[in-house]
Amino acid sequence: MIDSDGFRANVGIIICNRFGQVMWARRFGQHSWQFPQGGVDEGESAEQAMYRELYEEVGLRPEHVQVLTSTRSWLRYRLPKRLIRQDSKPLCIGQKQKWFLLQLKSQESAIDLAASGHPEFDDWRWVSYWYPVRQVVSFKRDVYRKVMKEFAPTALPFQAQENTQGGRRRGRRR
């Protein structure tokens, strides 16, 4: 679904483990890594799209995860001109995304990148929480930064608590 401004409705998914790490996936046959994401179909809610994409891209079902939170608003990024399909109607100039933070509740073995029969990723790994902001393709970086900042108090409760105390650790100096 592309809106009147040319932005395609999309959901982004951040899956975290109990150690505060996030799932980072490599695009099939490419050297680029990102969080799972995908379009919202007509008549589908953002949450329904998230669960569909969760299965299609990483093979997880609702019982494998717990939804911790979602972004308060839709976040947008523009595609670089070289990626815009000029002959496409309606013209899509970027994505507007609703993001979801999920906690993996099952074993890692439940992750199956080929579950849908059309894998979008060919590898994945756990990375530190802020790592994706530095590593994602440049045109998505601002959205990733905003999402990670919004989700940090939920995903990293101890870090968020430290930040409210001026970022200092208690204890003696060395």
From Swiss-Prot:
Enzyme class: hydrolase
Pfam families in alphabetical order: NUDIX (PF00293)
CC terms in the record's Gene Ontology section: cytoplasm
Domain Nudix hydrolase: 6-149
PROSITE patterns xref list: NUDIX, NUDIX_BOX
Transmembrane segments: none
Keyword vocabulary terms for this entry: Hydrolase
Gene3D superfamilies xref list: Nucleoside Triphosphate Pyrophosphohydrolase (3.90.79.10)
GO biological process annotation, one example: mRNA catabolic process
Keyword Hydrolase: yes
The keyword Hydrolase is assigned to this record: yes
Motif Nudix box per record, residues: 38-59
UniProt family annotation: Belongs to the Nudix hydrolase family. RppH subfamily.
Its job: Accelerates the degradation of transcripts by removing pyrophosphate from the 5'-end of triphosphorylated RNA, leading to a more labile monophosphorylated state that can stimulate subsequent ribonuclease cleavage.
Name of the featured protein: RNA pyrophosphohydrolase
Record lineage: Bacteria, Pseudomonadati, Pseudomonadota, Gammaproteobacteria, Alteromonadales
